[in-house]
Amino acid sequence: MKTIIVLLLLTIVAAAVVESSPKARRQTECQIKNDCQRYCQSVKECKYGKCYCNYAG
């Protein structure tokens, strides 16, 4: 039982580290809408530091 709990905690910690890695954040980080043009063909908005793109469909 302790082994399962330890493995679960390690998985959660590993996921948190990967999510907060600088490279992952750098990919869509923005201050203004124009910062998103290198990530999106059609920029929807920059909100809370994240780029949102318009997708055809």
Curated annotation (Swiss-Prot):
<comment type="function">
    <text>Inhibits voltage-gated potassium channels.</text>
</comment>
<dbReference type="GO" id="GO:0005576">
    <property type="term" value="C:extracellular region"/>
</dbReference>
<feature type="disulfide bond">
    <location>
        <begin position="36"/>
        <end position="51"/>
    </location>
</feature>
<dbReference type="GO" id="GO:0015459">
    <property type="term" value="F:potassium channel regulator activity"/>
</dbReference>
<feature type="signal peptide">
    <location>
        <begin position="1"/>
        <end position="26"/>
    </location>
</feature>
<keyword id="KW-1015">Disulfide bond</keyword>
<keyword id="KW-0632">Potassium channel impairing toxin</keyword>
<keyword id="KW-0964">Secreted</keyword>
<feature type="disulfide bond">
    <location>
        <begin position="40"/>
        <end position="53"/>
    </location>
</feature>
<comment type="similarity">
    <text>Belongs to the short scorpion toxin superfamily. Potassium channel inhibitor family. Alpha-KTx 17 subfamily.</text>
</comment>
<keyword id="KW-0528">Neurotoxin</keyword>
<protein>
    <recommendedName>
        <fullName>Potassium channel toxin alpha-KTx 17.2</fullName>
    </recommendedName>
</protein>
<keyword id="KW-0732">Signal</keyword>
<keyword id="KW-0800">Toxin</keyword>
<keyword id="KW-0872">Ion channel impairing toxin</keyword>
<dbReference type="GO" id="GO:0090729">
    <property type="term" value="F:toxin activity"/>
</dbReference>
<feature type="disulfide bond">
    <location>
        <begin position="30"/>
        <end position="46"/>
    </location>
</feature>
